[in-house]
Amino acid sequence: MDKKGAILEHIILLRGVTPNGQNAIPKMSYLVDILTEAGFQYVRTYIQSGNIILESDLAIEEIREQVHTLIKEKIGADLKLVIKNKSDFTKIVQENPFGEHYLYDRIHIILFQNAIQSLPLEKLNIDYGEEEICIGNHCLYLYLPRTAKRKKLNTNYLEKLFGVDLTMRKLNVVEKLLTK
């Protein structure tokens, strides 16, 4: 865990953002405003699905509590979130196990707030057909080809399998977040 004091750049991934309804975030610019007013620094977002980059000297758990509370109180959305240091995202991109023969836009990343190795990963030892899963140091890597008849490897399935909150992003979104 991070110690309070050093200002670090963090990436926050919101889980369950919807275009309308209970978990909608009407404008990402409003989210930037409320997080900035709360004292977070250099706050920015990427696409409407709930990707936030900010700087803070707070520990990750404190950031998580504050961001969750602010979104719930100011916007009304009760969203799960995963927060990682930007350096973790750099490692995730560098450690991508899928080579050039894989379609880049079909590679997905599953993130968990704690260490991925703390999950009961032995539960993944089943046949997923054309879909592939690789265990990384910081995440799970999924390859979900368009030709797969029924996509089993998705966030809902994995959350039920492990009994924890997870979130998924495409690898190209993770890479884009590093440039923001």
Give the residues covered by each predicted segment.
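Surface-exposed, charge/polar-rich loops and edge strands
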Residues: I7-S49, I53-K180
